[in-house]
Regions:
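Intrinsically disordered, charged low-complexity linkers and terminal tails
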Residues: 1-156
Length: 156
């Protein structure tokens, strides 16, 4: 799925790694975008587990076991509240899925989405948008959460 990204992952991965910010990446495939559903790929599942947000391995299949978690779309000039649904459908082997309410208004198929967290919310960044790159300046990123403050921010 990440191989379909319209934006190279290496540069943005380095940005977050240099700041010690845990990040996961998702790329909505054309089919997933149409259905507003994405596979919760292994690195995303690990990200959720490592941050104490969700453990898909312990989740049972079906709508009764869906978990909803607060989330936000990060825009260059504001943050828009949304939610993430983490679930395993009854079909097939219950492959883990994620659904972000309103995703279609925030991205296009094959856009690179970066997910960061302050452990209270998931923050979704459309890294395929040039305006989001500008908004990732450290002093702006720290407005999402103090966790994202780094030495560059403190120096300003």
């Amino acid at each position: 799925m990440l191989s379909m990204s319209d934006t190279p992952i290496e540069g943005v991965l380095k940005y977050f790694a240099d700041r010690g910010i845990s990040v996961a990446f998702l790329v909505p495939t054309p089919t997933g975008y149409k259905k507003s559903i994405m596979d919760a790929i292994a690195p995303f599942r690990s990200f959720l587990l490592e941050n104490g947000i969700h453990n898909y391995d312990e989740q049972k299949q079906g709508p009764d076991f869906k978990v909803t978690f607060p989330a936000c779309f990060v825009l260059p000039d504001k943050i828009v509240e949304t939610s993430a649904s983490l679930y395993r459908p009854c079909t097939k082997q219950g492959d883990p899925r994620v659904w972000f309410a309103g995703l279609k208004s925030y991205c296009n198929p094959c856009n690179l989405l970066g997910i960061v967290t302050d452990k209270k919310k998931l923050y979704i960044l459309n890294l395929s948008l040039p305006a989001i790159h500008e908004s990732l300046q450290p002093w702006k990123l720290s407005t999402i959460s103090p966790q994202f403050t780094d030495n560059e921010t403190e120096a300003q």
